[in-house]
Structures are given as structure tokens and as C-alpha cells.
């Protein structure tokens, strides 16, 4: 079967999803189309994501495809990138990159 992930960070390239193109209740939409939905309350937490993926793997062999809704904070961990759409599709300059990396000591390699 199939596992889909949806990043729900509340941002689009032109602003918040509520202001630009409100998608409504994504969970209800996937459910209406016959998907099993698993919610990940802290989609910025690697351990929680791994747990939800394991749950999805166990469920995806049943009758329904599985969707994991990841509630994330865009730019999480970098003070000047968090909670704004302005970094959607924009690369930091060298100075901003250095600052951002210094604010996030953990990497995927730590897991």
C-alpha cells in the first residue's frame, strides 16, 4: 500500500495558508477519500516522526492507504526563520546560514 506525508506548517510562498489559500480540514479530506490518517503533533520532533512512520507501516498493509499529517513550524530552531513565509523558497546568504546552523546543533546524523 502507500504512505503519504503532509507538512502542515501553515505557510505558503505568499503568506499563511489561512490568508492565501485556506485548505480547510485536511484530516477530514483524507478520511473522506478513504485514507487512514495519523497525526504527528510535533512534526519537528524526529522521534515522534519515527514513531508515526512505524505506526503507518503497520497499518498500510490493511485496506486503506495511510496519511501522516505533520504539524510543523517552518524554519524551526532558527529564530529569524520561524513562523514566517518569507523563507519559503529562499536560500540564506552565508552569514544567515552560519547563524542558522549555530542555532541547530542536532542533525539527522544524530539519530
What would you call each of these model-derived segments?
Residues 1-111:
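Glycine-rich ThDP/TPP pyrophosphate-binding loop and its adjacent helix/strand module
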Amino acid at each position: 500500500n502507500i504512505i503519504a506525508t503532509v507538512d502542515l506548517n501553515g505557510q505558503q510562498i505568499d503568506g499563511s495558508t489561512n490568508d492565501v489559500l485556506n485548505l480547510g480540514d485536511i484530516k477530514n479530506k483524507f478520511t473522506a477519500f478513504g485514507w487512514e490518517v495519523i497525526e504527528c503533533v510535533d512534526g519537528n520532533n524526529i522521534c515522534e516522526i519515527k514513531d508515526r512512520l512505524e505506526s503507518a507501516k503497520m497499518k498500510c498493509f490493511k485496506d486503506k492507504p495511510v496519511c501522516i499529517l505533520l504539524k510543523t513550524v517552518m524554519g524551526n530552531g532558527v529564530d529569524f526563520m520561524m513562523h514566517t513565509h518569507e523563507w519559503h523558497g529562499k536560500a540564506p546568504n552565508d552569514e544567515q546560514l552560519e547563524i542558522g546552523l549555530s542555532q541547530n546543533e542536532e542533525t539527522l546524523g544524530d539519530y
